[in-house]
C-alpha cells in the first residue's frame, strides 16, 4: 500500500481525477452506493435533508416538491442500476477485485486490459467496393509476385483492373476523342467484361443524358465488332424502360427512351421497337406518358419518316386526337403543337446522326430485332467477378481477335519494312550522290496521283470559298501551278459546275475569264468540249444539262471559237439520246442568250460553214431531213430555212448532175444513141397516134393532142440535149431557174396524167367484172378511158374481152332462158349491125362530154400542181388527190345512170 501511495503522491490533481473517474467506472454499483454512504458530502446532504424534514414537522405544511424530488432521485438510481446490470451481462465487471489484485492494478502496466481480441485482417480485394486505393505500381508488383496466372487472386486483381479501366474510359469519351477511346477500350478484354461495360455505359448515360448521342455512337462501333455486347445493352435498356413505365418513373423512361432512339438512329435497334414504345406510351395518354413520347419522337422522328412513313403518320394522328380531346394539361398540349411544328420543319434541329459520329458503314452494322414485350435476361451475373478455369486460354483468344480488329499483327512487318526502307534510302542517297557528281539529274515519277488529288482538293476549296468569280480567278492564278496542270484546272472547273443541282452562272463566268486570259486555257476547253461530247452518254441528265449550259455560255461570250461545233454530226446513226439532249439544251441556251435572228446569222456565216457541215448536213437528203425535224421539234425551226430550200432543190440538182455523169462516162457515140432514142420515141408517139386515129373517126382530136404531146416531149429532149452542150457544171444549171421550172412543171403534169390513167384503168377493170354479170348493161367507163391517150392495143384488148363476155352471157341466157322469151327477143331484137350503130352514136355523144370534162380536169390539175410548192408535208397532197378521185367517181356514176336510162332495154 505504501508503494502505491508513494507512486500516486507525485501525480497532479488532473491525474488524480482521472484515476478517480476510472475507478468509479470500473467499480460495481454496490461499491459505489457504499462509497456514497461513507462520503462526508453525502452525509452532509443527508443531514440537510433530514433537518429540513424535522423543520417541516415542527410547524410548516407538507412540501409536495420535496416528495417529487425524492421520487426523481429514486427513479434515477433505478435507471442506473438497470444500465449497470445490462453491462454486467455483456462483459464481466472488472470492479469485483480481490485485495491482492488491487495492488497489481494500481501499476501503469497493470492498468491496460490484459487481453484484447485482434481483428482478422481482411483482403482489400475481397471487399465489395474493392477496398482501399492501391496505386498502380503496387498493384503491378502484387500481380508479378503471383506466379500462377490461373489463381483466384490473380483473376480477381485483373477483374478489378478491368473494371476501373472500363469506367475511366467510358467517363472520358466525347465527340473529339471517341476514336481514341474505342482503340483503348478494345485493348481491354471487353468480352469478359461485357457486363461491366454495359453497366458503365447505362450509368454514364443516365447521369448525363445530354451525351446520349456519343454513347450511342460508342455502342454502335462496339456492336459492329461484338454484336452480343450491343444486344446485352439493348436488352437492359428495354427492361429499364419497362421498369420505369410500371413504376411511373418519368426520368427513367426519358433516359431509356432517349438512348433507344439514338440506337435506332445508329441502326443498332430496329424501328419496330420505336413504334411499339410510342404505341404503349400513347395508348392510355397521361401528361407524363405524352411528354416521354414527344421527347422520344423528337430524337428519332426523322429516321422514322425515312424508313416507316406510314407508322409515323399513325403516331401523329394519335397525337392529333389527343390534342383534340383536351384531356391533358395545357403545357403538354403546347408540347404536342411544338412537335407538329418540328415535323413541319423537317426535324432540322434533330438530325439522325450528328457530324463526326457517323463512324460505321451501313453494311458493317448489325441491327437487332428485339420486340418490347418479350422476356429478356439482363444477365446481371456478368457484373460480378467469377473465377474462370480457362482464364489464360480465353485471354489468348481475345488477343487474336484484338489483333484482327486493330491490325496489331502488322506492327512487326512495318518495323521490318521501316528498317528495309531505311537501308534502301541510304543506298538511293549514295546513288544520287554519285549521279550528282557526274552532273546528272534524277527525276521521280509519282504514279499514285497523290499530287493530283491534293491539287484538285485545293482548287475545290478555292472555288467554294470565293464570293464571286473574279475573286476565285485571282486565288487560282496566285497558286503558281505548273503548265501541265492547265487542263486539269479546266476539268476541275467543269466538274464543279456539273456537280451542282442547277447551273450557276459563276462557273461560266470563271471559265470565260480563264479563256480570255491565256490561249492555253481556251485550247484546253476546246479539247474538253470534244471529249465531253464523245463521252456524253456517261453523264446523268442533271450533269449533262449543267455542262451544256456552261459551254453555251462560253460560245455566246465568244470565249470559245465556234469551230468546236465541228465534232457535232446530226444524223440518225451518229447521235444517241444523250447527245441529242446535249445539243437540244446547248442550242436552246444559245437561243436564249443571243436570240433566234443572231443565232441564225451566226450559223449562216460563210467563214464558219465548213465547221457546220455536220450540224446542218447537206450531203444526204435523209440527214438533212433528220436535222430539219430535230431543230423543229426543239422549237428552233427558224434555223432550218436554208436546209428546207436545199431539200426542195435536191431533185433539180440530181437531175442536173445526171447528164454530167453520163457525159463523163459515155463515149463520143452517146450523142448518136441519144438522137436514135429520140427518133424512136417520136416514132412510138406517131404509131400511138395512128392507132388512136384508126379506132374511129371521132378520135381525130385526141390523136392530134397525143401528137402534140409527143412533139412536146421531143422538144424537151432537144432542150436537154441543148442544155448538155450549153453547160457542163451544176452551178450554171441552177442559175437557169426558168428553164428548169418549166421542165419541172411539165414533168409534174405528165406524172399527174399517168396517175389519172392508172386510176381510170383500175376502175375500168373493176366495172368490167361487174358488167360481165349483166348482158344488157353497157360498159361506159372503158369508153371513157379509151379517149384519154390509152394505147390502141389496150383498147382493142378491152373490146375483144367485152365482146367475149357478152357472147358468153348470151349463150348462158339462151341455155337457161324460157323459149317464149327467146322467141320474143328474136322478134324484137335488133341485128348486130343496128346494135353497133346505136353503140357508136352513144359513144360519140359521151366521148364529146368526157373530152370537155377531161380538159377542165387537166386545167384544174395543172393549177393545183403549180400551187403545190407551197405544201411542206405530203398529207395535204394526198388529201387533194383523194378529193379529185372522189369527184371523178361521182361524175362516172352520173354518166352510168344516164347511159342506163338511154339504153334500148329501158326504152322498150
From Swiss-Prot:
Residues 407-438 have a biased composition (Acidic residues). Residues 28-56, 66-85, 113-122, 726-792, 801-817, 826-908 have a biased composition (Basic and acidic residues). The keyword Nucleus applies. Keywords: mRNA processing, mRNA splicing, Nucleus, Phosphoprotein, Spliceosome. Residues 100-109 have a biased composition (Polar residues). Residues 1-130, 404-443, 654-908 are annotated as: Disordered. SMART domains: MA3, MIF4G. The modification Phosphoserine is found at residues 39, 61, 107, 786, 829. GO terms for cellular component: nuclear speck; nucleus; spliceosomal complex; U2-type catalytic step 1 spliceosome; U2-type catalytic step 2 spliceosome; U2-type precatalytic spliceosome. Residues 163-346 form the MIF4G domain. The keyword Nucleus applies. Residues 454-570 form the MI domain. Gene3D superfamilies: 1.25.40.180. PROSITE patterns: MI. Its main location: nucleus. GO terms for molecular function: RNA binding. One of its GO terms (biological process) is mRNA splicing, via spliceosome. It is found in: Nucleus; Nucleus speckle. Residues 666-680, 703-714 have a biased composition (Low complexity). Belongs to the CWC22 family. Required for pre-mRNA splicing as component of the spliceosome. As a component of the minor spliceosome, involved in the splicing of U12-type introns in pre-mRNAs. Promotes exon-junction complex (EJC) assembly. Hinders EIF4A3 from non-specifically binding RNA and escorts it to the splicing machinery to promote EJC assembly on mature mRNAs. Through its role in EJC assembly, required for nonsense-mediated mRNA decay. Component of the pre-catalytic spliceosome B and the catalytic spliceosome C complexes. Component of the minor spliceosome, which splices U12-type introns. Interacts with EIF4A3 and PRPF19 in an RNA-independent manner. Direct interaction with EIF4A3 is mediated by the MIF4G domain. Full interaction with EIF4A3 occurs only when EIF4A3 is not part of the EJC and prevents EIF4A3 binding to RNA. This is Pre-mRNA-splicing factor CWC22 homolog.
Amino acid at each position: 500500500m505504501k508503494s502505491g501511495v508513494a507512486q500516486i503522491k507525485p501525480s497532479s490533481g488532473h491525474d488524480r481525477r482521472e484515476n478517480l473517474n476510472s475507478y468509479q467506472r470500473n467499480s460495481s454499483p454496490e461499491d459505489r452506493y457504499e462509497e456514497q454512504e461513507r462520503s462526508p458530502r453525502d452525509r452532509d446532504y443527508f443531514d440537510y435533508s433530514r433537518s429540513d424534514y424535522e423543520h417541516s414537522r415542527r410547524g410548516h405544511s407538507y412540501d409536495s416538491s420535496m416528495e417529487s424530488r425524492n421520487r426523481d432521485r429514486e427513479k434515477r438510481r433505478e435507471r442506473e442500476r438497470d444500465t449497470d446490470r445490462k453491462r454486467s451481462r455483456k462483459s464481466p465487471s472488472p470492479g469485483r477485485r480481490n485485495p491482492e489484485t488491487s495492488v497489481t492494478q494500481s501499476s501503469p502496466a497493470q492498468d491496460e486490459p490484459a487481453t484484447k481480441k485482434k481483428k482478422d485482417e481482411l483482403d482489400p480485394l475481397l471487399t465489395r467496393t474493392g477496398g482501399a486505393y492501391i496505386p498502380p505500381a503496387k498493384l503491378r508488383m502484387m500481380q508479378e509476385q503471383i506466379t500462377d496466372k490461373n489463381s483466384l487472386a490473380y483473376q480477381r486483381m485483373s477483374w478489378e483492373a478491368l473494371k476501373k479501366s472500363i469506367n475511366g474510359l467510358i467517363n472520358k469519351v466525347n465527340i473529339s476523342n471517341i476514336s481514341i477511346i474505342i482503340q483503348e477500350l478494345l485493348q481491354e478484354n471487353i468480352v469478359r467484361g461485357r457486363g461491366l461495360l454495359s453497366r458503365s455505359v447505362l450509368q454514364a448515360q443516365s447521369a448525363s443524358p445530354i451525351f446520349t448521342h456519343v454513347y450511342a455512337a460508342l455502342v454502335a462501333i462496339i456492336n459492329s465488332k461484338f454484336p452480343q455486347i450491343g444486344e446485352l445493352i439493348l436488352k437492359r435498356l428495354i427492361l429499364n424502360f419497362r421498369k420505369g413505365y410500371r413504376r411511373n418513373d418519368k426520368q427513367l423512361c426519358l433516359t431509356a427512351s432517349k438512348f433507344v432512339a439514338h440506337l435506332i438512329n445508329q441502326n443498332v435497334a430496329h424501328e419496330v421497337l420505336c413504334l411499339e414504345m410510342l404505341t404503349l406510351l400513347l395508348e392510355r395518354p397521361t401528361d407524363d406518358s405524352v411528354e416521354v413520347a414527344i421527347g422520344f419522337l423528337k430524337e428519332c422522328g426523322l429516321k422514322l419518316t425515312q424508313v416507316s412513313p406510314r407508322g409515323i403518320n399513325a403516331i401523329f394522328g394519335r397525337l392529333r386526337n389527343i390534342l383534340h380531346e383536351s384531356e391533358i394539361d395545357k403545357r403538354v398540349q403546347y408540347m404536342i403543337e411544338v412537335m407538329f411544328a418540328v415535323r413541319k420543319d423537317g426535324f432540322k434541329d434533330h438530325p439522325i446522326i450528328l457530324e463526326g459520329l457517323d463512324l460505321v458503314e451501313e453494311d458493317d452494322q448489325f441491327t437487332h430485332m428485339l420486340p418490347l414485350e418479350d422476356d429478356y435476361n439482363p444477365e446481371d451475373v456478368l457484373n460480378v467477378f467469377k473465377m474462370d478455369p480457362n482464364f489464360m486460354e480465353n485471354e489468348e483468344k481475345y488477343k487474336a481477335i484484338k489483333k484482327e480488329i486493330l491490325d496489331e499483327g502488322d506492327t512487326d512487318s512495318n518495323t521490318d519494312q521501316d528498317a528495309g526502307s531505311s537501308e534502301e534510302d541510304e543506298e538511293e542517297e549514295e546513288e544520287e550522290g554519285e549521279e550528282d557528281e557526274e552532273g546528272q539529274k534524277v527525276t521521280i515519277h509519282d504514279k499514285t496521283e497523290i499530287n493530283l488529288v491534293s491539287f484538285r482538293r485545293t482548287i475545290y476549296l478555292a472555288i467554294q470559298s470565293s464570293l464571286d468569280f473574279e475573286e476565285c480567278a485571282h486565288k487560282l492564278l496566285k497558286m503558281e501551278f505548273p503548265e501541265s496542270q492547265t487542263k486539269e484546272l479546266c476539268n476541275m472547273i467543269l466538274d464543279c459546275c456539273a456537280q451542282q443541282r442547277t447551273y450557276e452562272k459563276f462557273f461560266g463566268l470563271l471559265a470565260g475569264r480563264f479563256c480570255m486570259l491565256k490561249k492555253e486555257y481556251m485550247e484546253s476547253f476546246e479539247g474538253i468540249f470534244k471529249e465531253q461530247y464523245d463521252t456524253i452518254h456517261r453523264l446523268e441528265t442533271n450533269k449533262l444539262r449543267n455542262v451544256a449550259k456552261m459551254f453555251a455560255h462560253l460560245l455566246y461570250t465568244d470565249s470559245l471559237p465556234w469551230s468546236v461545233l465541228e465534232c457535232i454530226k446530226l444524223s440518225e446513226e451518229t447521235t444517241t439520246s444523250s447527245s441529242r439532249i446535249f445539243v437540244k439544251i446547248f442550242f436552246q441556251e444559245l437561243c436564249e442568250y443571243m436570240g433566234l435572228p443572231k443565232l441564225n446569222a451566226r450559223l449562216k456565216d460563210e467563214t464558219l460553214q465548213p465547221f457546220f457541215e455536220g450540224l446542218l448536213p447537206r450531203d444526204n437528203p435523209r440527214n438533212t431531213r433528220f436535222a430539219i425535224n430535230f431543230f423543229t421539234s426543239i422549237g428552233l425551226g427558224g434555223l432550218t430555212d436554208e436546209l428546207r430550200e436545199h431539200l426542195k432543190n435536191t431533185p433539180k440538182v440530181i437531175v442536173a448532175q445526171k447528164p454530167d455523169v453520163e457525159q463523163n462516162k459515155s463515149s463520143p457515140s452517146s450523142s448518136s444513141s441519144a438522137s436514135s432514142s429520140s427518133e424512136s420515141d417520136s416514132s412510138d408517139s406517131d404509131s400511138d397516134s395512128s392507132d388512136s386515129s384508126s379506132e374511129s373517126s371521132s378520135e381525130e382530136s385526141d390523136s392530134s393532142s397525143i401528137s402534140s404531146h409527143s412533139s412536146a416531149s421531143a422538144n424537151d429532149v432537144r432542150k436537154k440535149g441543148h442544155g448538155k452542150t450549153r453547160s457542163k457544171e451544176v452551178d450554171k444549171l441552177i442559175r437557169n431557174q426558168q428553164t428548169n421550172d418549166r421542165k419541172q412543171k411539165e414533168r409534174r403534169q405528165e406524172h399527174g396524167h399517168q396517175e389519172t390513167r392508172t386510176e381510170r384503168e383500175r376502175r375500168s377493170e373493176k366495172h368490167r367484172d361487174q358488167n360481165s354479170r349483166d348482158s344488157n348493161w353497157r360498159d361506159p367507163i372503158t369508153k371513157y378511158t379509151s379517149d384519154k391517150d390509152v394505147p390502141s392495143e389496150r383498147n382493142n384488148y378491152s373490146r375483144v374481152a367485152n365482146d367475149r363476155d357478152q357472147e358468153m352471157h348470151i349463150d348462158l341466157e339462151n341455155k337457161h332462158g324460157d323459149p317464149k322469151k327467146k322467141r320474143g327477143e328474136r322478134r324484137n331484137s335488133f341485128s348486130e349491125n343496128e346494135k353497133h350503130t346505136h353503140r357508136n352514136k352513144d359513144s360519140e355523144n359521151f366521148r364529146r362530154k368526157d373530152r370537155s370534162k377531161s380538159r377542165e380536169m387537166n386545167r384544174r390539175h395543172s393549177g393545183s400542181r403549180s400551187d403545190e410548192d407551197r405544201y411542206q408535208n405530203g398529207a395535204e397532197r394526198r388529201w387533194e388527190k383523194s378529193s379529185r378521185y372522189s369527184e371523178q367517181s361521182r361524175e362516172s356514176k352520173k354518166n352510168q345512170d344516164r347511159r342506163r336510162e338511154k339504153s334500148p332495154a329501158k326504152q322498150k
